UniProtKB/Swiss-Prot annotation:
This is Glutamate-1-semialdehyde 2,1-aminomutase. Its cofactor is pyridoxal 5'-phosphate. It holds the Pfam family Aminotran_3. Homodimer. It comes from the Bacteria. It comes from Neisseria meningitidis serogroup C (strain 053442). Its main location: cytoplasm. Its EC number is 5.4.3.8. Pathway: Porphyrin-containing compound metabolism; protoporphyrin-IX biosynthesis; 5-aminolevulinate from L-glutamyl-tRNA(Glu): step 2/2. One of its GO terms (cellular component) is cytoplasm.
Length: 427
């Protein structure tokens, strides 16, 4: 029995399911999860000492590569001054100022510790600002695990959603409408029926939780026009896409100014840090200025802020995103060519340093499209690559990530392994 198996058995005896976040359990792909001992650059090593080229990137934060020396030094210096104060620091002002410079839609910003906190509070803030209760989210978009957002589609068009997790009362989700992503007709009908009651619309502007799904230009335009017309708050959940698909996030690519933005992952440089921000008039409804309550003992933690500030400095350097985008495109094009040569039905897409792999003829436009892809083929591909030292997220529904540490040569090596795997799948 190898170390991964030993540790998984040990973990299951004390941690529910053996993991602290469900996707890590390998439940959707089968097998034993790899317990990671260390990470550096584009690589991770498991407890057996096996090295993997990593395209998980801690689910997005590791944009500059794991254990980047400058980030590690910033964390070390900050830690020497104390781990947590429960009081304001200059660093939290500095990171808020930096984010506001990068994202013009962010006039005011509040730091929290997780993406779930950010989206949960943004929803509360939108409701407090508008005095309305109903919200719109889209099937397949994930916005953390707060009760009002753990919702799946109802039984019919524009019916209110049902809880997607045990322990969530139906009353908590009765104000949540779940619509199909990229479906403008549903969006228009929802506002026609309930426009005066809708507090906000929240979406992933590139969906990373049903692999990678792009919004159409018309869909994005309709979102902005309808929310403005009806006085609803448009929330871009950029926890995954912020600073990942472009320096200014998805909103900079769409040319959209959302009313509120949630962010996380990259802004913490691998440490627990997230934020929500946006229009001054909305943000000033938050306590202590307004009646919408939010607080957190570790919000703006100085160690996480130090990691985030250094990461933001690195990604703003000349050529960073041009190189990141080129490497990601090199990867997905290599995969397309390899799959086509093997006669495997497959396509791939990317934006910035984020990519999606689909065992289907066309990239999905919504959750239903993604659900029709060949999930079994993904499982075979996942294990074929993992067995050869290449790590992807253990779910067909998760996007992948490239970092600045992935060199062109390393991408070529990954594609060469994919050629072997696709040939084996076709045999």
């Amino acid at each position: 029995m190898n170390r991964n198996e030993i540790l998984f058995d040990r973990a299951k005896a004390i941690i529910p399911g053996g993991v602290n976040s469900p996707v890590r359990a390998f439940g959707s792909v089968g097998g034993v999860p790899r317990f990671i001992k260390k990470a550096e650059g584009a690589y991770v090593w498991d407890e057996n000492g096996t090295r993997y080229t990593d395209y998980v990137g801690s689910w997005g934060p590791a944009i500059v590569g794991h254990a980047h020396p400058e980030v590690v030094e910033a964390v070390r210096e900050a830690a020497l001054g104390g781990l947590s104060f429960g009081a304001p620091t200059e660093g939290e002002i500095a990171i808020a100022e930096q984010i506001a410079k990068i994202m013009p839609s962010v006039e005011r910003l509040r730091l929290v510790s997780s993406g779930t906190e950010a989206t949960m509070t943004a929803i509360r803030l939108a409701r407090g600002f508008t005095g309305r209760d109903k919200i719109i989210k889209f099937e397949g978009c994930y916005h953390g695990h707060s009760d009002s957002l753990l919702v799946k589609a109802g039984s019919g068009l524009l019916t209110f959603g049902n809880p997607s997790s045990a322990g969530v009362p139906a009353d908590f989700t009765k104000h949540t409408l779940v619509l199909e992503y990229n479906n403008i007709a549903q969006l228009e009908e929802a506002f026609a029926q309930s426009g005066n009651d809708i507090a906000c619309v929240i979406l992933e502007p590139f969906v990373g939780n049903m692999n990678l799904v792009r919004p159409t230009e018309a869909f994005v335009k309709a979102l902005r026009e309808l929310t403005e017309k009806h006085g609803a708050v448009l929330i871009y959940d950029e926890v995954m896409t912020g600073f990942r698909v472009a320096l200014g996030g998805a909103q900079s690519l769409h040319g959209i100014m959302p009313d509120l933005t949630t962010m996380g992952k990259v802004i913490g440089g691998g440490m627990p840090l997230a934020a929500f921000g946006g229009r001054k008039d909305i943000m000033e409804c938050i306590s202590p200025l307004g009646g919408v309550y939010q607080a957190g003992t570790l919000s703006g933690n100085p160690i996480a802020v130090a990691a985030g500030l250094k990461t933001l400095e690195i990604i703003r350097r000349e050529g960073f995103y041009e190189n990141l985008t080129a490497r990601t495109e090199q990867l997905v094009q290599g995969f397309r060519t390899a799959a086509d040569a093997a006669g495997i039905e497959f396509t791939a897409d990317s934006v910035g340093g984020m990519f999606g792999l689909y065992f289907a003829a066309h990239a999905p436009r919504n959750y239903a499209d993604m659900a029709r892809s060949n999930i079994d083929a993904f499982k075979r591909f996942f294990h074929g690559m993992l067995d050869r030292g290449i790590a992807f997220g253990p779910s067909a529904y998760e996007a992948g990530f490239v970092s600045a540490a992935h060199t062109p040569e390393l991408i070529d090596e990954t594609v060469a392994v994919a050629v072997e795997v696709f040939k084996a799948m076709a045999a």
